[in-house]
Amino acid sequence: MSSKRYTLAQWLEHAEAGFSQQTQWRVPGVHDQSPRLEAQWLLAAALEKNIAWLMTWPERELTAAQLQRAEAWLARRLCGEPLALLRGEHEFWSLPLSVTADTLVPRADSERLVEVALERMAQMNLSAPAILDLGTGSGAIAL
């Protein structure tokens, strides 16, 4: 590990450059992926903060431990590992779900599927329908 020191703003620029040069981190079929936003999400997650906090304190210097974690996560993310797996958690319909390499990470289109199902059930006046969620991954849809 180098003894390089970074402020939050400097590390975000460093990570953004990495994301701009690599393509493995991109999700196929999703066209609005921003290297800057990806860097912000990654650093916020690594520091267990939110993006607003990063923007409020751009001059704050990363500690050695924070830098080590951020760099390790950046290397894994650049190789295509989803941020949710780095964090061990993914939010689905405002529910924080634990995820591992053994589970499928719920996607935005899965949330849309739930929305459509709820709309259809309302149209059909189904107040307590029987629904089977079998073999769909993390079980997020059933929740």
Predicted regions and their residues:
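Non-catalytic nucleic-acid substrate-recognition regions in nucleic-acid-modifying enzymes
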Residues: M1-P35
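Short, polar/charged, Gly/Pro-enriched helix-capping and turn/loop motifs at alpha-helix termini
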Residues: W25, G29, A84, M124-S127
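Conserved SAM/SAH cofactor-binding pocket of Class I
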Residues: R112-L143
